[in-house]
Amino acid sequence: MRLVRPADARDARALATMLGALLAEHQIRYPDTYPRLDPVAGAAFYGAEWGRRLGTDPSCNVWLAADRDIRGFLAGEVWSRPVGEPPSAFFVEWVYVVPEHRKSGISRALFRDGLLPYCRRHGIDVVEGRTVPGDEQWARRGWATTAVSVMRGVDALMLDVAERSGDTALEGARQ
């Protein structure tokens, strides 16, 4: 009998273990993932955060799929926008299913029995997420790309924006 239930602070250790496995898997499958998180340190950080926030912070939500053991989780937060549409969205941060239980409907159950009823109860009409280059699973499932994150190292950006002879944009401002 599979059950999807909200996680609570007592689940933080199991969540951290699964997140560590997800981070390690992602670094192998998507070596250019940004930002890079050490699987152990990243899992420890998020596990501690979940332990602190679950049950006390209504914007932090995690659902577990369990049978006799925990087989997967979906974690995310409600994001509000002071300006723009939609005014709020649920941002999915992590979805993970233990490898030996994949392709058995667990991920669908986490969305169907955990996230979607929550969104309906709270008037949330949009679910968002972020993925890494090369991870095409979301597009295959009908998710639309709405934004692309970009990054540049500070040292490289410093070279990009260095003053050059002929720059006149701020000559008067520096005097």
Language-model regions: role of each:
Residues 64, 69-78, 91, 96:
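Conserved beta-strand in the GNAT
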Residues 24-50:
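Conserved GNAT-fold acetyl-CoA-binding loop/helix
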Residues 97, 103-117:
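Conserved acetyl-CoA-binding loop-helix of GNAT-fold acetyltransferases
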Residues 44-63:
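A short helix-loop-beta-strand connector motif used in the catalytic cores of GNAT acetyltransferases and
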Residues 80-92, 102:
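A conserved beta-turn-beta hairpin within the catalytic core of GNAT-like acetyltransferases
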Residues 3-18, 23-29:
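A short beta-loop-alpha structural element at the N-terminal edge
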Residues 81, 128-132, 139, 144-159:
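Conserved catalytic-core motifs of GNAT/GCN5-like acyltransferases
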Residues 119-131:
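Conserved GNAT acetyl-CoA-binding A-motif
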